[in-house]
């Protein structure tokens, strides 16, 4: 465990140096975040909206200009520079393994005191599924198994199968090289498929689990979209 702590400390120092020496990083973060946050966002005097961010990044520059509204929240779930940062494995199949549990992100988050994540999503209500979060946007995450437990909790919270929650997955768009866009779309599509297949297998109704992605597509609730990063 001491070796893991040393690695986290060394990585924190490296990342802090990279952020400090990259003069354009802050402005790029702001521009890029605002492009994604505003994409497809409804507005109007009679429409209330709030935004929450679950960041798997260890930097907090976006939080400096984040405005999520009264019900919004910004959470660096694995810590951030200047404090304790967390590396670890997913706890889904490890919480009963005494040799592995202390290396899971779940255990290490608990040991750190946890994070206030109650405002990240609006959960679905069985009597009114429209209460659930309208849109969940993803960018820059591999969607790999290391963070699967977070996605499962979010999808359960919004009752993904029955609600109207839309999933939007973004990839870096190149307006010159279409082959790069195709490569990004293919890779992202495979990752989304793996994520939704894994999640579908946890649903009580196994038929619902098998056709989850098909249902999302038919209802216009599964979207891939390119976004320019320059």
Model-inferred region functions:
Residues 1-117:
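Extended, H/D-rich, highly charged conserved domains that either
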Residues 85-131, 178-198:
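Acidic, metal/cofactor-coordinating or nucleic-acid-engaging core segments within structured domains
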